[in-house]
Amino acid sequence: MENKHIPILLNEAIKSLNIKSDGIYLDLTVGMGGHSSEILKRLKNGLLVGFDKDLFAIEESRKRLSKIGSNFQLIHSDFNNVADELAKLNINAVDGILVDLGISSPQVDNAERGFSYSKDARLDMRMNTNQALDAHFVVNTYSEDELITIFYNYAEVKLAKQVANAIIKNRPINTTLELAEVIKSAYPAKLLSLKNPCKAVFQAIRIEVNNEFSSINSMLVQALNLLKKDSSLAIITFHSLEDSIIKKFFGNLIKSKHPSKMPIKEEKKYIVKVYSPSKAEISENNRSRSAKLRVLTKLI
């Protein structure tokens, strides 16, 4: 069965990279190859290097990209290893970098992966299925304080203490639907009627399992060092906490180093642009509604 995944903010992301036919481009979250395939179509003598810690994504994108060309390399790795992995290819600078921080549709839709709170499966949520830490371990062994911390820090979960307490009391919890019911049991009916709390709690557990925020911060530093002059780093985010990491990192780079009242003209090193999905894209793909594309371009 073919895995359907619609790349989000595709046109805006590709345009922002200003692709040169002989350039070197990175897709640090190759996924199902939606964005990567459009990059590869524009490369004549250039090279696309794609990263993903999900081996299934690597295999699926390879099939898709092979139909377009052969000038690509796929690396099964977390993007926080990007500099080391590129060094193995003797690459120390690139012409553009794309990062899509969203979880892909096939990952959500495949019940066995344990990401979905509406489909029953063993608690898993690992992007890299070779790693030991999974959602089952987090849910069944973390202390109440540890659970409260990840719920609040990674998803701003309302009633985080009550949810953590409910999880502790109902252990062992083995499946996604069991966890969903436990989460709901911590909320009064009035709050449940307004919003399903499972989305935020599952998000927090997924971020913990995959060490996502730490990886993002490491990746940002490495990506910045890899950019050539006049090249761009384009990052698509899907929730406010994730986006705030990117916004803060980019903001610090473009912020003036001098007091505002000092009449010193600074040479701009970077510019930042922000894009949101069009109404048309949102109507065609509801998953795009919370997406945001931030693009940092290195000027000197």
UniProtKB/Swiss-Prot annotation:
The keyword NAD does not apply. One of its GO terms (biological process) is rRNA base methylation. Its EC number is 2.1.1.199. It catalyses: cytidine(1402) in 16S rRNA + S-adenosyl-L-methionine = N(4)-methylcytidine(1402) in 16S rRNA + S-adenosyl-L-homocysteine + H(+). GO terms for molecular function: rRNA (cytosine-N4-)-methyltransferase activity. Signal peptide: none annotated. Pfam families: Methyltransf_5. Keywords: Cytoplasm, Methyltransferase, rRNA processing, S-adenosyl-L-methionine, Transferase. GO terms for cellular component: cytoplasm. It is found in: Cytoplasm. It comes from the Bacteria. InterPro entries: RsmH, SAM-dep_MeTrfase_MraW_recog, SAM-dependent_MTases_sf. The keyword Glycoprotein does not apply. S-adenosyl-L-methionine binds at residues 33-35, 52, 79, 100, 107. This is Ribosomal RNA small subunit methyltransferase H.
